[in-house]
Amino acid sequence: MTSSCSLSRPQHLFFFFFLFVPFLSLGQQISVDINSAIWEFPSNPLCLSQQSNFAKSSQFSKNLDSLVSSIPSLKSNTYNFYSLSVGSISDQERVEAIGICNRVVNRVDCLNCIAQAAVNLTTMYCPQHRGAYVRATKCMFRYSDKPIFGKLETSPVLEAPNPSNATGDRNEFIRLQSELLNRLRSMAASGGSKRKYAQGTDPGSPPYTTFFGAVQCTPDLSEKDCNDCLSYGFSNATKGRVGIRWFCPSCNFQIESDLRFFLLDSEYEPDPKPGNDKVKIIIATVCSVIGFAIIAVFLYFFMTRNRRTAKQRHEGKDLEELMIKDAQLLQLDFDTIRLATNDFSRDNQLGEGGFGAVYKGVLDYGEEIAVKRLSMKSGQGDNEFINEVSLVAKLQHRNLVRLLGFCLQGEERILIYEFFKNTSLDHYIFDSNRRMILDWETRYRIISGVARGLLYLHEDSRFKIVHRDMKASNVLLDDAMNPKIADFGMAKLFDTDQTSQTRFTSKVAGTYGYMAPEYAMSGEFSVKTDVFSFGVLVLEIIKGKKNNWSPEEDSSLFLLSYVWKSWREGEVLNIVDPSLVETIGVSDEIMKCIHIGLLCVQENAESRPTMASVVVMLNANSFTLPRPSQPAFYSGDGESLSRDKNQINHIASLNDVTITEFDAR
């Protein structure tokens, strides 16, 4: 502690006494005090008018009282969903009830909220009604004398739209919001019988950069009923507002344009393990006494070392707290991820790189995820982990993959991404059969999307970033084959006004074949490093071959040299994938992309265009392109290329392998 916060010795004794006294309560059952919790409830009763009243002396009244009074003693669960009943199924006086909380509410608060909602509903809002429904800010409770488990109910409706109308293109605003909600609807509906919930973000419509959405159904519903309920809500809710919350008994949703009004998903604490309460109390008491004695004996040493330990705590700030505070991401425990990936089964493995393996996972409520488990042997686990969490979580663009969450437990470093069943571009473009799926329209869309994503990283995001590992395997494809740039483990952050400048590193990491010569040889990197990698990728997409490919007639030429030689000799057909030539020939658009690719892979970094120029060139119908100079590592007779290759053959083989730290020459 600093001098301004120091305590005298008597104060220390009282401080530590009161610090340890609370441990006496360890192991005791958590009591639910419905009077101490403060929740916001609607002032108007939501009694179901079609259901008649009951007499206070009736069996239904007794059953309802029994049900309500039992809620505080329920064992809380991590799913925040409770279904209760009193009375036999054939009994006309049977009461059925459902309580559910928002996903962001912790389980103890959830039970508090439902308990108070039940009391308010039966004593204040709808006394003696045989059916009623109430929605608080964090929970919902409903009961009925009719069967309600697994039954879709869309009435009554509560709607809370933001009073502000959207500005900009209203139709585009509504369309993009609908796309996000419909995507989340499918995810939530496919959840299990314990949770039907999904949340996510999508790029917004200017001037709104991001849309934040969350949808939820009571998990007793079938997949069809959940879909129908949310579809009904989407159709009937007020359109064109900057934010809205919509509720009915069976489902609810929220969509916002401002993160300040959107609660991110929280992680739940595990259920307490069963044990002997008396033993726990005895152990806690003994520990408290021993702890108090130790503190009293060594108080002097604590006080003298106080300033130093405070500094150490500050410098060694817990990485987990840093990730949660800075990134505001969903954090999952290791056991949840191990279950989702079938204990990291090889059948679930999607790929493997220099930093670890990627697995497909399915969470217990049905959401598919991609799990990147960083290798503890890579030597860069923490560095890559911090890079991806701190950078990617704050980036929002339709052509960048979204980081959903993370796990930090012991030595485990795990990143959780949105899952794409189409996997990555390299699975298509380098496969002779799958490549046929990629017509020119799709390939051009991929080229343009990657260009826009890199432009966002270099110039348009709040953080200016050089990716440093742009390649086909780091371009994921969504259901519509739109590209998403992935893997930011080696990305570097620049100051806003420094993206045009050059930096140096003594530890070069990346994939040979995509590396710019100045980066591979001397560790020099800038935005032009990514431009070079993009140019290689463009030529791979057009030719349908890896950058280490050689023609049968001349094994000394690799892709860049072959393209340059064919371009200079006017043999453009040699540069284009035969499947494209058969369908559309060599169009002006293909010629333009070849030209842009060659401009990007020029040996001189200053001659390469910026990504802003690339995007302009791709979108322009008539644009005079500058003449490209020869690409890096080119030699017509192959000698220069061989010499350059031998000079850096310690980096990696010509295979598409990401390599980690090595000293640049």
UniProtKB/Swiss-Prot annotation:
The record's InterPro entries line, in alphabetical order, gives: GNK2, GNK2_sf, Kinase-like_dom_sf, Prot_kinase_dom, Protein_kinase_ATP_BS, Ser-Thr/Tyr_kinase_cat_dom, Ser/Thr_kinase_AS
Its UniProt entry gives the catalysed reaction(s) as: L-seryl-[protein] + ATP = O-phospho-L-seryl-[protein] + ADP + H(+); L-threonyl-[protein] + ATP = O-phospho-L-threonyl-[protein] + ADP + H(+)
Entry's Gene Ontology molecular function annotations: ATP binding; protein serine kinase activity; protein serine/threonine kinase activity
Q: Where is the signal peptide?
A: 1-27
Q: How does it sit in the membrane?
A: Single-pass membrane protein
- Phosphoserine: residues carrying this PTM: 473
Give the transmembrane ranges: 281-301
Residues carrying Phosphothreonine = 511
- Pfam families the UniProt entry points to: PK_Tyr_Ser-Thr (PF07714), Stress-antifung (PF01657)
What are the record's GO terms for cellular component? membrane
Taxonomically, the superkingdom here is: Eukaryota
Instruction: Please state what the protein is called.
Output: Cysteine-rich receptor-like protein kinase 41
What is the species of this protein? Arabidopsis thaliana (Mouse-ear cress)
Q: Which gene encodes it?
A: CRK41
